[in-house]
Design a protein with these regions (language model features):
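Nucleotide-sugar donor phosphate/pyrophosphate-binding loop at the beta->alpha transition
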Residues: 76-83, 118-120, 128-146, 150, ...
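N-terminal strand-loop element at the rim of the active site
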Residues: 6-77, 161-164, 175-176
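Short His-centered aromatic/hydrophobic patch
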Residues: 99-104
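A short, active-site helix/loop in glycosyltransferases that binds the activated sugar's phosphate group
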Residues: 150-176, 183
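Structural motif
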Residues: 3, 95-96
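Active-site proximal beta-strand in glycosyltransferases
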Residues: 3-5, 112-129, 144, 155, ...
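Alpha-helical elements of Rossmann-like donor-binding domains used by nucleotide-donor carbohydrate transfer enzymes
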Residues: 20, 51, 80-87, 107, ...
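Glycine-rich phosphate-binding loop signature in dinucleotide/nucleotide-binding domains
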Residues: 88-95
Length: 183
């Protein structure tokens, strides 16, 4: 049975965008784990997060609390989260890590490289785009370009991101969200 870790900074992202993927993986008899911050930074209520955790449990999905901060500038908190993530990876042999969100994606790809686990990163819209503030380009573009080289499959949501990723990012594979999911 394939074991897949679905990783994001916060639980609300998994709830709002990944439940169909989680169900699909379970239907394919994958052992699915979700790792994210169930406590802080979510854009849904604590009650909704509790319901979401119950839904995951009913599907047989294992949950891991990772204390990520949404901001990349909370370095100590995110360093602790990275240590927690590495502990999860040490405890279970994962066949794939599916990363979402900029912070979760960076730490997930770093950990995947350290543990030699194939990694998928879905960019739900790069923070650098035509018309974005210069600050976004200076901060996010070089980081995403660097970590794309540690990415087996980079999935983009919109055509601008896809075109830029193909031309500049150099992931092993780049796909549009409109293509079939790579599981």
């Amino acid at each position: 049975m394939k074991r897949v870790l679905m990783l994001s900074t916060v639980a609300s992202l998994q709830d709002q965008f990944n439940m169909a993927n989680i169900r699909m993986l379970r239907n394919l008899h994958c052992d699915v784990h979700v790792a994210c911050n169930f406590v802080q930074g979510n854009n849904t209520s604590p009650q909704r997060i509790a319901v979401f955790q119950n839904e995951l449990a009913a599907l047989g999905v294992t949950c891991h609390q990772i204390d990520f901060a949404r901001s990349p500038f909370h370095l100590l908190q995110n360093h602790r989260a990275y240590q927690q993530l590495k502990a999860v990876l040490r405890a279970d042999a994962f066949d794939c890590i599916d990363c979402h969100t900029p912070v979760g994606g960076i730490y997930g790809r770093q950990a995947a490289a350290a543990f030699q686990i194939p990694v998928i990163y879905t960019a739900h819209g790069f923070h650098f785009f035509q018309g974005a503030p210069l600050w976004n380009w200076l901060l996010f573009y070089p980081v995403e370009k660097y970590y794309a080289r540690k990415t087996d499959v980079l999935i983009t949501i919109n055509s601008e991101d896809y075109d830029r990723a193909v031309r500049k990012m150099h992931a092993q594979q780049t796909r549009s969200a409109r293509s079939r999911h790579p599981y």
